[in-house]
Amino acid sequence: MVHNDLDFIFYNNLKHSSGAIEHLGDNLTGDGDXDDEEIIIDLSLIPQNISRINFTVTIHEAGERSQNFGQVSNAYVRVVNSDNSQELLKYDLGEDFSIETAIVVAEIYRHNGEWKFNAIGSGFQGGLAALCRNFGLNV
């Protein structure tokens, strides 16, 4: 569950109040090489009351445009060490989400004082609104 609306980082709230998480902006086209969107996280600044961070993707106005993630190719999430640009891990979404318009891709969570990564790949119909309801938010 999200503690409050300000903990939900997305295209209308790009930076967490702690400064620990910043979304560098929404790529509306997906054109070009390399990463389309970036989220910068400083784990040392994450408030102690936050034990889990979920990474999600949605398709804006997917219903109106008859779009879903089954139509998206080459989608992935990767974790990169910003100090040396080393890729620590990469999770490919695949094209198995034929009706989903929102996906919980992965999470990082605290375990015994360390941060761990968990690939999830759980899809939702209903886009951003359905995703928000899943985390206890109303849009």
From Swiss-Prot:
Pfam families: TerD. It comes from the Bacteria. Not known; could confer methyl methane sulfonate (MMS), mitomycin C (MC), and UV resistance. Belongs to the CAPAB/TerDEXZ family. This is Chemical-damaging agent resistance protein B. It comes from Clostridium acetobutylicum.
